[in-house]
């Protein structure tokens, strides 16, 4: 996810969502937009129909968001975002950018609120994913050696004890 480390900074996430939404002109994006914003727009255009189907499965998502309820959004959208690979992270950003575009057509809320709301949830999901990875990498599973590994370790110890370079070689092991 090195290419998407910008997602760990809230202002960068907000800028990325803003640049990749339909509220930014393609000309501005072409001249001054980041390469990630251009990629997100491309993904959003390529997968428009799949994103439409996903939104249809969410039911009354925009109605609940317009009323200020976040539970459905958290359950159906945020918890299903995947950041395991750079491609999936880009698709997650594209989906939220698509949601911003659709939501802005159907709401009385300001564009700044929509942008802040989606950027905050995306940023929190990325941070949660990163913390989960750090936690998993710090936990080491107990390694139980197999019988072959135990036998190999015993042979290695015997060879080391019998080595002429070992100062204790040839001594009685009971001492």
UniProtKB/Swiss-Prot annotation:
GO terms for biological process: symbiont-mediated suppression of host apoptosis. InterPro entries: Adenovir_t-Ag_E1B_19kDa (IPR002924), Bcl2-like (IPR002475). Keywords: Apoptosis, Early protein, Host cell membrane, Host membrane, Host nucleus, Host-virus interaction, Inhibition of host apoptosis by viral BCL2-like protein, Membrane, Modulation of host cell apoptosis by virus. Residues 147-175 are annotated as: Disordered. GO terms for cellular component: host cell endoplasmic reticulum; host cell nuclear envelope; host cell nuclear lamina; host cell plasma membrane; membrane. Its main location: host cell. The keyword Cytoplasm does not apply. Belongs to the adenoviridae E1B 19 kDa protein family. Putative adenovirus Bcl-2 homolog that inhibits apoptosis induced by TNF or FAS pathways, as well as p53-mediated apoptosis. Without E1B 19K function, virus production is compromised because of premature death of host cell. Interacts with Bax protein in cell lysates. This is E1B protein, small T-antigen. It comes from Human adenovirus C serotype 2. The lineage of its organism: Viruses, Varidnaviria, Bamfordvirae, Preplasmiviricota, Tectiliviricetes.
């Amino acid at each position: 996810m090195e290419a998407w480390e910008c997602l760990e900074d809230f202002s960068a996430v907000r800028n990325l969502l803003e640049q990749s939404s339909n509220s930014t002109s393609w000309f501005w994006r072409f001249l001054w937009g980041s390469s990630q914003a251009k990629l997100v727009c491309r993904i959003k255009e390529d997968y428009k129909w799949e994103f439409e189907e996903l939104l249809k499965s969410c039911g009354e998502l925009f109605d609940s968001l317009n009323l200020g309820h976040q539970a459905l959004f958290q359950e159906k959208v945020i918890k299903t975002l995947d950041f395991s690979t750079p491609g999936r992270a880009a698709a997650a950003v594209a989906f939220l950018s698509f949601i911003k575009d659709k939501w802005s057509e159907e709401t009385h809320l300001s564009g700044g609120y929509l942008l802040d709301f989606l950027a905050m949830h995306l940023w929190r999901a990325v941070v949660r994913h990163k913390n989960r990875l750090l936690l998993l990498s710090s936990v080491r599973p107990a390694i139980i050696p197999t019988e072959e590994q135990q036998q190999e370790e015993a042979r290695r110890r015997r060879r080391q004890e019998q080595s002429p370079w070992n100062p204790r070689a040839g001594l009685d092991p009971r001492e």
